[in-house]
C-alpha cells in the first residue's frame, strides 16, 4: 500500500502483532441522567453527530500514514514554536485519527474521511492499536496478567489488553536517547488496546510498577507503520 512519500532522517525498520478485545464501559453520571430524562434528545444528538462526519467518496479520500518523531506535536499548529505535523506533511485538509503524546513516536493516520477517522479511534469499533513499549524493569507474567484483565486508573477501569514480552525491535534510535539506569534491566512489550485515553499505555505500565521509557505505536487496525522512518509520510489506498 503506497504512492506518495515524504521523508526526513531515519534509520531502521520494524514488525509486530495485533489483537482484539471485548467492549465494556460505564456512562458518566451526567450522561446517564441525560439519557434517563431525555432519551429521544440523546438519540437525536448522536444521529446528528454521525451525520456531521464528512463522507468522502473513494476517489477523493485521502489517507496519510506518518511516522511521528519524538518531540513533535500531533497537530498542525502551535503558538509556542514547537514542532508540529506541518513541519513534515504538506497535504491539506487531512486530520489525525487519534493523537500521540509529544514524547511518543510512531504511526499516525491522517485522513479527510470522518467515517474512517471514527472507525480507527472509537472503542465501539473495536479497532486494535498496537504499541511497542520499553519499560523500566523486568515485569513477570503475574504483572502482565493484570493488564490483560484490566487495571483501575483514575479515569476508570481499562478494558483487557493483549500483552506479550518481545525482543527489542529493530528500529531507529531515539533522539535524544532513552535514559537508562545502569543497574536496572529494561523490557520491551507489545501492548494492544482498543481504547485511546490520554497517556493510557504509560499509565497502565506505571500502575503495575514498570514505568514506560519509550513508546512507539506500530499499528492501527490493519494499517501498520511498515518501513517508514521518523518524519516520513506516505499516502496509501485502503
Swiss-Prot record:
Similarity comment: Belongs to the pseudouridine synthase RsuA family.
Biased composition range(s): Basic residues: 9-26, 36-53
Active site: 101 (nucleophile)
Top-level division of the source organism's lineage: Bacteria
Entry keyword set: Isomerase, rRNA processing
Family matches, as InterPro entries: PsdUridine_s_RsuA/RluB/E/F_cat (IPR042092), PsdUridine_synth_cat_dom_sf (IPR020103), PsdUridine_synth_RsuA/RluA (IPR006145), PsdUridine_synth_RsuA/RluB/E/F (IPR000748), PsdUridine_synth_RsuA/RluB_CS (IPR018496), RsuA_PseudoU_synthase (IPR050343), TruA/RsuA/RluB/E/F_N (IPR020094)
Keyword Aminoacyl-tRNA synthetase attached: no
MF terms (GO), sorted A to Z: 23S rRNA pseudouridine(2457) synthase activity; RNA binding
GO BP term, pick one: rRNA processing
EC number: 5.4.99.20
Pfam families: PseudoU_synth_2 (PF00849)
Protein name: Ribosomal large subunit pseudouridine synthase E
Catalytic reactions on record: uridine(2457) in 23S rRNA = pseudouridine(2457) in 23S rRNA
Biological role stated in the UniProt entry: Responsible for synthesis of pseudouridine from uracil-2457 in 23S ribosomal RNA.
Gene encoding the protein: rluE
Region feature (Disordered): 1-54
